[in-house]
Design a protein with these regions (language model features):
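Glycine-rich phosphate/adenylate-binding loop and adjacent beta-alpha elements
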Residues: 1-24
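Mid-domain Rossmann-like dinucleotide-binding core that forms the NAD(H)/NADP(H) cofactor-binding site
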Residues: 30-109
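A generic alpha-to-beta junction signature in SAM-dependent methyltransferases
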Residues: 53, 121, 133, 146-147
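Helix N-cap at the beta1-alpha1 junction of Rossmann-like dinucleotide-binding domains, i.e.
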Residues: 89-91, 111, 136, 159
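Short amphipathic alpha-helix with an adjacent loop that forms part of the alpha/beta core around
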Residues: 110-123
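Short SAM/SAH-binding signature in class I
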Residues: 124-132
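Glycine-rich phosphate-binding loop and adjacent beta-alpha segment
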Residues: 136-196, 234-236
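C-terminal hydrophobic helical "lid"/dimerization subdomain
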Residues: 140-141, 184-236
Length: 236
């Protein structure tokens, strides 16, 4: 029965909207820019909650986009050892320098990824793999990067079929999970973490534009070389 305004129901672009007060998550401390990030971060929060990751766990995040980065924020809170894999080296550098992940691995699609993951993780594969790519190819191949009795968690979404041999998950006794959304408690927790300075939103807010500047600015945001992480549109 989950319904999201602007997704399942019309009204996401209304100037004014009447909602039950219990659906709102206010903060007297955060800026509007910070509040705009809460929903994005909630996807990562729920994902890490579903993974039940704990301190010292070796975790691989595949995909250094906003969803993968959101997961990273809460893996940091859980004090896990984080490796990020992506084909975009600029994004990997951002994750290393701005988000403080432990290791990065460039995806080259040459069959060396598992060995390189072992190299940076002390000879072991991660116990948890979070696939945030939304690519059915990546999601079908994620099992080769996880250790025995580990888990693969899908937070990226695809409409394509996933294909893998049963023995791929049966022999190493893997667990498969999915993470779709967030719950009200996640929003309250995220607001508190930002208010307390545990999560730094500054690296996320890479670009901003006024309402009048949005039309000429938007095409630039679509260019990879622009380095957009999250862009904020000011409506005033």
């Amino acid at each position: 029965s989950l319904e999201v305004i602007g997704v399942h129901k019309d009204g996401g672009m209304c100037e004014r909207l009447v909602l039950p007060a219990r659906k709102l998550h206010p903060s007297e401390k955060l800026t509007m820019e910070q509040l705009a990030l809460v929903e994005t971060l909630a996807i990562g929060c729920n994902c890490v909650n579903r993974s039940a990751s704990s301190s010292g766990d070796k975790v691989l995040v595949i995909g250094a986009g906003p969803i993968g980065m959101a997961a990273i924020e809460f893996l940091k809170v859980a004090k896990t050892e984080i490796t990020v894999m992506d084909m975009n080296e600029t994004r990997l550098q951002f994750c290393k320098e701005k988000l403080g992940v432990d290791h990065t691995v460039v995806f080259k699609n040459d069959g060396t990824e598992a060995d390189r993951l072992r190299e940076v993780n002390g000879g072991e594969l991660p116990i948890t793999v979070i696939d945030a790519t939304g690519s059915h190819v990546s999601m079908s191949n994620a099992f080769q990067y996880v250790s025995f009795t580990g888990q693969v968690l899908y937070v990226g979404i695809t409409t394509q079929e996933l294909s893998f041999k049963h023995v791929t998950i049966h022999r190493p006794e893997l667990t498969i999970k999915a993470s779709r959304n967030a719950v009200p408690g996640d929003f309250k927790r995220i607001i508190s973490l930002i208010e307390d300075g545990v999560i730094d939103t500054d690296p996320w807010l890479s670009h901003q534009a006024s309402y009048d500047d949005f039309i000429p600015e938007f095409p630039n945001w679509l260019k990879p070389e622009t380095g957009v992480i999250k862009a904020v549109l000011h409506m005033n």
